[in-house]
């Protein structure tokens, strides 16, 4: 892919077997997000990034039992593949806009922060719940994963053999 920056300079992004790149368009095709899993800087953007950036928002139903706020797009897709609703902001460290949380609370009975099981994910999900617990029905779900690069998020949880039923059971266990 090649682009022209706002300063008029051209640049290109090239994928190879050694450096794969995945991308998807957002914001009506006005922007693109690249994921480079083997690069030091794994994420890149080009075009117009909506503010706030929320992946999955337009796929949410008007109402429902629960919605998950996750750390990334892959998490949202993994949840959807198992019949759950989710969204992701730009990262786990992104601040959740109060107006969006208010809207979610009007549409869903519960909002669950489902961040990675690493140090950052645990810290940030605890902070989000602390920030909003007195105003909205928010909680956090801690996955029983070691928090390593290979075992930290919901896609890893399902990849190691857990089922949709196991996930529902985990939700119910942590609720009590």
Regions found by a protein language model. Give the residues of each.
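TOPRIM fold recognition
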Residues: 63-67, 73-176
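Phosphate-handling DNA/RNA-contact segment within nucleic-acid enzymes
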Residues: 1-108, 124-125
């Amino acid at each position: 892919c090649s682009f022209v920056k706002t300063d008029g300079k051209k640049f290109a992004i090239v994928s190879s077997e050694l450096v794969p790149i995945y991308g998807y368009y957002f914001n009506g095709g006005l922007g693109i997000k690249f994921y480079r899993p083997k690069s030091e800087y794994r994420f890149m953007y080009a075009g117009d990034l909506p503010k706030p950036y929320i992946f999955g928002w337009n796929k949410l139903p008007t109402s429902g039992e629960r919605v998950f706020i996750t750390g990334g797009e892959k998490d949202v897709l993994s949840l959807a593949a198992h019949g759950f609703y989710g969204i992701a902001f730009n990262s786990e460290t992104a601040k959740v806009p109060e107006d969006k949380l208010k809207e979610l609370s009007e549409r869903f009975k519960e909002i669950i922060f489902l961040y990675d099981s690493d140090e950052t994910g645990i810290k940030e999900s605890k902070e989000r719940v602390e920030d909003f617990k007195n105003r909205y029905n928010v909680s956090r779900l801690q996955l029983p994963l070691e928090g390593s690069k290979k075992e930290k998020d919901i896609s890893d949880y399902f990849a190691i053999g857990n089922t949709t039923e196991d996930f529902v059971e985990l939700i119910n266990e942590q609720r009590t």
